Regions:
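Generic structural "secondary-structure junction" signal
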Residues: 20-21, 28, 33, 105-108, ...
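ATP-binding/phosphotransfer module of carbohydrate and carboxylate kinases, centering on a glycine-rich
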Residues: 1-7, 46-48, 66-67, 114, ...
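Glycine/GP-enriched mid-protein hinge/lid loop-to-helix segment characteristic of carbohydrate kinases
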Residues: 40, 44-153
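Small-residue faces within membrane-embedded alpha-helices
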Residues: 14, 79-81, 229
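Short, active-site-adjacent cap segments at secondary-structure transitions
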Residues: 17-21, 57-60, 83-84, 93, ...
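Glycine-rich phosphate-binding loop and adjoining helix at the ATP-binding site
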Residues: 1, 5-72, 194-205
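Short beta-strand/turn micro-motifs composed of small residues
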Residues: 15, 77, 185
Length: 243
């Protein structure tokens, strides 16, 4: 597509990695090896204003845009690598060092699989799309095609294990922030109603406080959620919605 330069407000970049509070650099980017990557690496080469954003926070921006009724929410970004974000007070919670919502590094089992962060048993090693791919021994799309169209006990058990670990994390985090949960990212389109009901049952199974079905939502934009969410930075500027 050819767009007139005056029609382009800027370029917003959603990247894996924790962004500095001033938005000028990546302070931790072990997955992509982009630690210390600078916003100026892009802005110096592109003829438009540039904005850098953590992909999980960008995803949360989009989910908040799509769910304006939510004052607070927990976002699980089920991409190739797991991501998380928190919405509080109708905005994405950043934290003092931009590290709020890193659900992927909650320890599920201290003796579990090695995580890229150097620890073991992080939620990343159980609930990322990559972890599901490794457990299934096949691409994610193929896994769900077989799972949804055939009776394959082995694959059903793999998916059940995945949902069990996700439910464990949701149940514990929901005690910290009493709010709705949004399943977002690459794996979200594969979730069926039966999966959500199973997940809800596992969340409530050992919980004193019960979550209801209306508190569990699925995002609509799949793997493109962070990219669309990042673009909202300039959309909000155009609409004069930035604080």
């Amino acid at each position: 597509h050819q767009y007139l330069p005056e029609k382009i407000s800027g370029i917003s970049i959603a990247t894996q990695g924790i962004i500095s509070p001033d938005g000028t650099a990546v302070t931790y980017g072990n997955i992509m090896g982009n630690t210390k990557m600078q916003l100026s690496d892009f802005s110096s080469r592109l003829p438009y204003p540039c904005h850098l954003e953590h992909d999980s926070k960008a995803a949360a921006d989009l989910e908040l845009w799509n769910h304006p009724q939510f004052d607070s929410a927990l976002i699980f970004l089920l991409n190739q690598n797991l991501g998380g974000a928190m919405i509080t007070g109708h905005s994405v919670h950043q934290g003092d060092h931009m590290r709020s919502g890193l659900f992927e590094h909650i320890c599920i089992d201290p003796d579990g699989p090695a995580c890229y962060c150097g620890n073991r048993g992080c939620l990343e090693t159980y609930c990322s799309a990559n972890a599901l791919k490794v457990a299934a021994g096949m691409p994610v799309s193929e896994f769900f095609n077989i799972l949804h169209n055939t009776q394959t006990p082995t694959l059903s058990q793999i998916w059940q294990n995945y949902l069990d670990h996700l439910a464990f994390a949701i149940r514990n985090l929901n005690l910290v922030i009493d709010c709705p949960v949004i399943i977002s990212g690459y794996l979200a389109p594969y979730f069926m109603e039966s999966d959500l009901l199973y997940l809800l049952n596992k969340i409530n199974e050992h919980s004193l406080f019960q979550m209801t079905r209306d508190q569990l939502s699925v995002g609509e934009h799949g793997q493109y959620t962070p990219a669309i969410g990042a673009s909202l930075h300039y959309v909000k500027q155009f609409l004069n919605l930035t604080k």
